Amino acid sequence: EPKLPSAFAVVNPNRLDVESGEGRLAAVGVAFLLAIAINRVLRDKGWYGERSEPNLMQWLDLVALGTVCDVVPLSGLNRALVTQGLKVMAGRGNPGIAALADVGGVDETPGAYHLGFIMGPRVNAGGRVGTPDLGSRLLATNDHAEAKDIAIRLDALNRERRDIEQAVLDQALDQMTDDPDAAGAVAFVSGQGWHPGVVGIVASRLK
């Protein structure tokens, strides 16, 4: 195994010396399990003797959102985290996620589809074509008015992202149509001014 960095702990289920079998966890799942482990150590050491212990389960809605949007296999622990996270999400305790559901027209109990195709793209839209910190601000705020405002902005950015993506995709497909050699086992397309925030999505749609 390559030399590990100098650190108190290198938390990665894909390390060669880890036998957990959880190498397909999304990063958000790894972070959540780390938080649980740290919380357990603090509890055992009496840290919460005169302090309130945090309810980590309330964050499972964020874990579910991140897991689905990372497109990891929804099996094993990933599936369990998403299943429980969707239950938390249905309670609308996170103002940002509730606002996302509202602007996305999700008026039913959310499922993995809603996370992957309705809510996730809106969270990511700020980073693709707008202000990168909008998504994190939305998910971190406890202010319902602020959450609504940010969600509306992200919804608008997501529409803009779709328009830009479609324009780039159309140009890429035109190139493949005009050049028979471009549509072989490996396709090469390029364009002046293509937005870097959508080229990855377009590439995946050319497969």
Model regions and ranges:
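Flexible loop/turn segments at secondary-structure boundaries
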Residues: P2, V18, H195-V198
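Histidine/acidic-residue-rich catalytic or RNA/ligand-binding cores of hydrolases
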Residues: L4-P5, P132
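Short alpha-helices
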Residues: P5-Y48, L56-V68
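Hydrophobic helix-and-loop "lid/oligomerization" segment in the mid-to-C-terminal part
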Residues: R40-K207
